[in-house]
Amino acid sequence: MEDKKTTRLRFNLFDVVIILLALAVVGAAVLLRNRSTGADMTRTTTPVRYTVELACVMKDMANQMRVGEDIYRSTDGAYMGKIVDVRWVPHVGREFLPEAGRFVRYEVPENFDIYVTVEGQGYWNGRDIIVEGVSPKVCGEMFVKGKGFAHAGYVCNIDLMGAQIAQGDRTGSGNLEATYVIRFDDMREMLLGAVHKGDQIYEKLTDALLGTVEDVWTEPYGETRLGADGQAVYADKEDVYYMYVRLKGRMVEKADGYYLDSGTELKVGATVTVTSQYFSRMGTFYALEGMEEAK
């Protein structure tokens, strides 16, 4: 009979072999996973800045925001980056004057629009700009917090600080290539540079490709109100615009209509929420300009 010391030694050696085999399996699995997501694992990060507008707030809130401090997403506590700039301007309201038949601008006492610029390490994943795990989009809502403050705002600018990103190269699967226009209402001037020729636009809810931007143009934005005589008056809003985006994309013709890759029917007058690498907002299908067989 073998003594207990020899038996224990054999068991220990056997355990070591099992552990080494298990580690080898785990290591192989990790290696395969890294290879399958190589584009993500080998990404190069670079400093990216974006500005969040916190509209119509008391100036005391701005005093709580200090350059150099960390800022977080208030919904889940995710780190967003560091504050590199804080500025505020008087909040401007607009009111329609029936007697004059136009909108007038006025400053709201003791209320300000605060612009907080955040810097973090970002990268391009082929679809979105990711900054510290957050994907900022111009017009996209952002819930922020820091020491002594928390508020909801909207991203109004993204600065890649000289970095370059490639255009998307996805194509749709429809048999028709269509040219159509989406209109975005009530766009302030600071937001107009977020969509560029060559950008790929997606439907936000489904991530299906809508098309590639062919052209972007603007017109003054206005609203219809009742004048002093009770008649309808159309009046422009100063520094506010309609933004029109012409897209070329694939779709499928069915017996009851034209359908995009997402399954959404393209109907002039229907709304759609879109997203791109810089931008996210709800718009309206404005025009279907033409279509031809896809090549």
Residue ranges with predicted function:
Residues 2-295:
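Beta-strand/loop-dominated core regions that host nucleotide or nucleotide-derived cofactor-binding catalytic loops
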